Amino acid sequence: MAALQEKKTCGQRMEEFQRYCWNPDTGQMLGRTLSRWVWISLYYVAFYVVMTGLFALCLYVLMQTVDPYTPDYQDQLRSPGVTLRPDVYGEKGLEIVYNVSDNRTWADLTQTLHAFLAGYSPAAQEDSINCTSEQYFFQESFRAPNHTKFSCKFTADMLQNCSGLADPNFGFEEGKPCFIIKMNRIVKFLPSNGSAPRVDCAFLDQPRELGQPLQVKYYPPNGTFSLHYFPYYGKKAQPHYSNPLVAAKLLNIPRNAEVAIVCKVMAEHVTFNNPHDPYEGKVEFKLKIEK
């Protein structure tokens, strides 16, 4: 039977550990001599330098295949989303309630519109160009300053009676409010095969007390988004791009009754029946005007 090994004392263990850390007989530190530590350190330095260089080279080659003028992330929706101004969200979506006799109930709404349209002032649009072609504005090269592409102007005065210039209250005071409709941007999206997309607003459910459909006055006329604002080439290619707008002035909203309204963008390549996204191609909101 093998003899049992003698159990080492604490002092012996400490002595062995000290000799492992530094052995004066062999000149080893942590099991290696100084020269071996130098060589192994140089090996790992060279190894990680080479690995870092290879990684940087692969990353550089990959970045050369990426177009800097194409967004890194894009939505999978086929059609752009549609937004509304002023945008007041309640528990069940967009809900706008105000009293024509109390300006405190609609002052914030008009201020929201003024703040939004500040980006469409002549000063804010001075870097864009005037476009009148009413056709798609294709740009294959970067002919604008700083290696960019031109953007077409859209100024607030194009919204005429809903611009906030002639009527700073946007019709809220008289119970005929203006709402501004905007399509979200999709790079290189073409809304139709040649006809300008237009906005069409209607009651979701016809109010019983109103025997006629929703009456709307659109600005610009016919409620169209001119084709020369398309296609959009991205934020880097068109840093001064502004979304075109359509204003809808609602003329026959009944008093003291909540009505549901939907505004759709009518175009060949715009869909508005996506059950998973209620804002694709259209915007729905509830409106109640009290007196």
Curated annotation (Swiss-Prot):
Query: Which residues of this chain are annotated as glycosylation sites?
Result: N99, N103, N130, N146, N161, N193, N222
Superkingdom field = Eukaryota
Instruction: Show the disulfide pairing.
Output: C131-C152, C162-C178, C201-C263
Task: Tell me which Pfam families the record gives.
Answer: Na_K-ATPase
Which segments does the topology annotation call Extracellular?
58-291
Topological type in the membrane: Single-pass type II membrane protein
Name-wise, this protein is Potassium-transporting ATPase subunit beta
Organism from which the protein derives: Homo sapiens
Q: Supply the gene name.
A: ATP4B
